[in-house]
Amino acid sequence: MGAVWTVRLLCLFLLLLNTRQSAALPHNTDQCAEGSDACHIDAICQNTPTSYKCTCKTGFKGDGKHCEDIDECDVEYNGGCVHECNNIPGNYRCTCLDGFHLAHDGHNCLDVDECVFNNGGCQHVCVNTMGSYECRCKQGFFLSDNQHTCIHRSVEGLSCMNKEHGCGHICKESPKGGVACECRPGFELAKNQRGCILTCNHGNGGCQHICEDTEQGPICRCHVRYMLHADGRTCVERDEMAPTAPDHNATSLAEVDKRVKRRLLMETCAVNNGGCDSTCKDTSTGVRCSCPVGFTLQPDGKSCKDIDECELHNGGCDHYCRNTIGSFECSCRKGFKLLTDERSCQDIDECFFERTCDHTCVNSPGSFQCVCNKGYTLYGLAHCGDINECSFNNGGCEHTCENTMGSFGCHCRAGYKLHWNKKDCIEAEDSPLVPPPARPTLNCNKQGGGELCYLTCQSQVHISSGAEDSYTVTCGMPLPCHTGGQWNGSYCPGSGIKTIATFKSGQGKCNLKRSHENLAHSFKTALSDKRATENVQFSFVSLHCASSSRQQRSRHGRKAGEEEGSFITAQFELDVNLEEVTAEGCDLTCVRRRSEKRLRKTIRTLRKSINREQFHLHFAGSEYELAKKLVRPADTPDHCGTGQILLDKKCVKCSVGTYYDGEQGRCFLCPPGTYQDEEGQVSCDVCPGPEGRGIPETAGARNISECAGQCRPGQFSHDGFVPCLPCPQGTYQPEVGRTSCFTCGGSLTTKYDGSVSFQNCETKVQCSPGHYYNTSTHRCIRCPVGTYQMEFGQNYCIACPGNTTTDFDGSTNIMQCKNRHCGGELGEFTGYIESPNYPGNYPANIECTWTITPPPKRRILVVVPEIYLPIEDECGDYLVMRKSSLPNSVTTYETCQTYERPIAFTSRSKKLWIQFRSNEGNSGKGFQVPYVTYDEDYQELIEDIVRDGRLYASENHQEILKDKKLMRALFDVLAHPQNFFNYTAQESREMFPKSFIRFLRSKVLRFLRP
C-alpha cells in the first residue's frame, strides 16, 4: 500500500495509528487518563513526564483551568457576518434577516426572490425588491388590504374604489366620508398623508448589508470587506488586487518621457516589491511583474486580475462552475458527487444503504425511489406499511373482510361460499359446485436404472427469486375443509400431515431452467407406466433451493474439499383421506399412520431422484429441471436469479404481465387467457371464467381484472362474466367480474344505471377531501385520527398504513400518516439518531430522548448533515444536546431552525443527552444525525478540523459531510483506525476530492509536528 494512495484516502488515520502510538514515551501516572486533573471542561489535558498541562480548546480563552467562551461576534467586525452574528460555545454562526438567505461563504447575505415561488402569493404581478417584494395590480384594479389580491376599480365617487384616491399603499374610507391612507408594515406615512416612505424595518430598507434610517429614507452601507455598488443598495467584494483608478488626466506608459524611463530603470524588487501585485523579478530593463496561475497581468504591467475560468467551456465542469479568486470550483447537482478529478460528476447510489428504503430501493440518476411490496403502501417517502384494504369499501367484500399483513381476505356468512373472484358470496345450495383446484402431484418411475420424478402443478403456482442461485416455488393451497366429501370452497387447517425434508442435488446450482429434452413424452410415460413407484397428491408443496459454494461450506465447518451443489428444503402437506376410515378396520389414527408411512416412502424415492438430478417440475404447460453446471458466456459479468434478466449490467425482474423463459433467457408477454400480477415470475396464471363462450383474449394481462369476458365496472351478472347487466339506479360497482352491486344507502339514488362509484350517488351535499359522507345523517363527517381521504364525495376514510397515524382529524393524503417511533441506532462506536417518520415530516407533539455513552477514554464527534425545523413555530420544535437532562447542564448543540449547510462538532461532555420535541404547529423533514466515538488522544486534531471554516467553505466539502457512504468510511476509520487497511487503493482513489485530502493533510502534519 504505498504512501501516495495512503494519503489520498485519509493519511491522518494511518499516521495517527503508526506515529502517535509508537512515539509515546514512558511516563509516570497519567493524571489526564485517570480524570484527576484540574482542567476545565472546555480545556484539553496533556500529560507531561512530571505532571500535566491544561490548554483551552479552540474558541475558548483562559489558563486551561478556567476557560470561557470567546465571543467571536464582538471581534473581527461582527465575526465577518454582514447581518446577524450568533455566538455559540466555542464557535459562532451567521444568520440573515427576513428576505435574505445565507451565501455559500457562510457570512454574506443574498436577496431571496420571493416571486419565484407561487408568484409571491400575488394575484396579478409580483415585483421582487432587495430583502422583500411587493404585489401590483393590472390596469383597472387596485391592491386590497391584504396587499396580495386585486379589486376592480369603480370610476365614480370619491372612495377607495376610485383610482384617484392618491394613497401610496392602503386606502380606507373614513366614517365621515373621504379616504384615509395607511402604509404597509415597515413604511411610514409621508407628510402629505398620501405617500409611504420606506424604513429599515421592511426588507432591510432595500439594503443588502447595513441600513440606517434618515429623514430622507434609508441609507445603505456595506460590511468592511465589501464596497457599495453604484445602485446604492448592493454590496460587492473589494478587489484588493485591483489598482487604484488612474487619474483621467494621466498619460499612458507609452507617452512618458525619458526621465520616467530612467526612473523605471532605478526601480528594484527590493523596494515595495517593485510595485508588483504578485511576483517581481529584476531585469536589465527594470522590474518585471508576473501573476500566479489563475490571474492575468493587466496593461499597467503591475496589477493581477482574476481569470474567470468558468467563461470558457464551463471550466471543464460536468455540472456547475463557480469562479473563485485565483481559481474555480466545480460542483454537482443534488444527487451527484464530484469525482477525484474535481471535474466529473457521478450519480450517488442512495440504494447502497439497506436502510434507505424499507422494501425496495430503485436508484436513478440524481435521485432514487422507494417501492413497496404488494399489499403495502409507501409513507414518509421511504417507509412501507401494510394496507388495510378492509378500511375502504369493505375491501370490496360482499360480506365480511379480514385484513392480514400484506393482503386481506373476504369471508362469507353461513350458507354462502366465496365466488371465484374471492369477494362475492354465493349460496352454497343453489349454486353449481366449484371444482377444487388441481392438487400438486408427484409421479415417479424407474428409468435408466434410477428414479425419475415429476412434480406437477396445474394451478396456484408462485415463484420468487432470492439471492443469487436461489429460488422458492410454492404450489397448491393450504388443506381444505370437507363436508360430506364435497368441496365447500373455503379453507381450514383440516386433518392432514405436514413434514419438512432437505435434499442435496449433486453438483447442480439452483436455477429453474426450461428443459431442452423432450420431457413431455417422458412425463406422459411416467403417468401411464405400470412400473410407477409413486403417484401422490399433496395439498400444498413448498420448495426452497439454495446453492452452496465451497467457501460458504468451509466457513460453516464442512470439509473444504466437498464439491459444490444445491440443497432443496421441501415442505409437504398431505391430506388424510377420510374415506379410508372404517368403523371396524381402521380409525382416523390408523389412517394417519398409513399416510405418514406413505409420505416417508415418497421422500426416500424423491431423495434418490434429486441426488441423480432427475427431478423435474411441470407447471404452466412447461417442464423445468435443476440446471447442472452452468456454462456461461465469457462476456456475461453476473448471474441473475430466476425470473430476472441482465439489462445494462443490472439484474432486472420480468415486469407484471410477463413471464421468464429460462431456455431463451428472456421475458415474454403472458399468452391470451392468462395473467401475471407479480414481477419475476416464470409462468402466468390461468384467467378464470366459463369455457366455450368464444371470448377474445388479449396477451400481457397484468392482473385478473384484465382477463377478458368479465363484467366491467358498473356491471354485474350471476357469475361475473358476460352477458352482463348494468347496476340499477341506487347502486354502483367499482370492480370487474362481480355478481352484485353495492347500494348507495340512505335511500340515495344515482343519476343513471351502471354507476361505478359512490361518487355517482346523488348525495345531499358533496364532501370535500378529509371527510366522508354519512348515509344515516346525510352529513359530511371529518375523517377520524388515523385515517384520511384524498377524494371528493366518498363514503369512507382510508386507514393509515402499518403503525402510523395522523396528527389531527380531517387528513387529506397518506403523507399525513406518520410513524411516531423515535428512530436511530445507538452503538458504542458509531450510530445515529433520527426524527420520527424521517425522511417524511415528523409528527406533532412528539418527544424523543437519546443518550450516547461512549466507552472509556473515547469522545463523541457529531455531524449534522442538514436539519429541517420550521422557524415559523417560534422555536416550538427544537433539538438540544447537552450533558444531562438538567436544563443548566453543559450544552453542546441546540437549534430550532432549518440549516441545509452541514456542521460537525465534538461533544463538550463525555456523555450526550439528546432531546427532540415538537409542538402542534408546523412540521418539517427533521433530521438524521450520525455520530462516532474516537480515541480522546486525537481530541485536539479533531477539534482543529471541525472548527476550521475551510471544512464548510467548499460546496464539495459540504457534500462530503452529506454523503452517507463517505461518512461511513470516515467514521469507520475514526472509530477503529486499524480498519484503514480494509480499504483498497482503488477505493481510496474514488472516495474524496483532492482539495479535501489537502485540507486534512495540513491538519495532520501540524498535529504531528507542533
From Swiss-Prot:
Glycans are attached at N249, N488, N703, N774, N803, N982. It is found in: Secreted; Cell surface. Residues 28-68, 69-110, 111-147, 160-196, 200-235, 269-304, 306-346, 347-385, 386-426 form the EGF-like domain. Residues 822-934 form the CUB domain. GO terms for molecular function: calcium ion binding. InterPro entries: cEGF, CUB_dom, EGF-like_Ca-bd_dom, EGF-like_dom, EGF-type_Asp/Asn_hydroxyl_site, EGF_Ca-bd_CS, EGF_dom, Growth_fac_rcpt_cys_sf. Pfam families: cEGF, CUB, EGF_3, EGF_CA, Ephrin_rec_like, FXa_inhibition. SMART domains: CUB (SM00042), EGF (SM00181), EGF_CA (SM00179), Ephrin_rec_like (SM01411). Residues 1-24 form the signal peptide. It comes from the Eukaryota. The keyword Signal applies. GO terms for biological process: blood circulation; muscle cell development; muscle cell fate specification; muscle organ development; signal transduction; smoothened signaling pathway; somitogenesis; sprouting angiogenesis. N-glycosylated. GO terms for cellular component: cell surface; external side of plasma membrane; extracellular region; extracellular space; secretory granule. The keyword Chloroplast does not apply. Residues 860-869 are annotated as: Interaction with the cholesterol-anchor of SHH. Its main location: secreted. Disulfide bonds join C32-C45, C39-C54, C56-C67, C73-C85, C81-C94, C96-C109, C115-C126, C122-C135, C310-C321, C317-C330, C332-C345, C351-C361, C357-C370, C372-C384, C390-C401, C397-C410, C412-C425, C822-C848, C875-C896. Keywords: Calcium, Developmental protein, Disulfide bond, EGF-like domain, Glycoprotein, Repeat, Secreted, Signal. Disruption phenotype: Zebrafish 'you class' developmental mutants are grouped together based on the anormal U-shaped morphology of the somites. Homozygous zebrafish mutants show disruption of the formation of hedgehog-sensitive muscle fates, with an altered myotomal morphology from a characteristic chevron shape to a more rounded U-shaped. One of these 'you class' mutant results from disruption of the Scube2 gene. These mutants lack slow twitch muscle and muscle pionneer cells, and PTCH1 expression within the myotome and neural tube is essentially absent. Lipid-binding protein required for SHH long-range signaling by binding to the dually lipid-modified SHH (ShhNp) and by promoting ShhNp mobilization, solubilization and release from the cell membrane. Acts by enhancing the proteolytic processing (shedding) of the lipid-modified N- and C- terminal of ShhNp at the cell surface. Synergizes with DISP1 to cause an increase in SHH secretion. Probable cell surface coreceptor for VEGFR2 involved in VEGFR2-mediated angiogenesis. The CUB domain is important for the interaction with the cholesterol-anchor of SHH. The CUB domain regulates protease recruitment and activation during SHH shedding. Interacts with SHH via the cholesterol anchor of the dually lipid-modified SHH (ShhNp). Interacts with PTCH1. Forms homooligomers and heterooligomers with SCUBE1 and SCUBE3. Interacts with VEGFR2. This is Signal peptide, CUB and EGF-like domain-containing protein 2. It comes from Danio rerio. The gene is scube2.
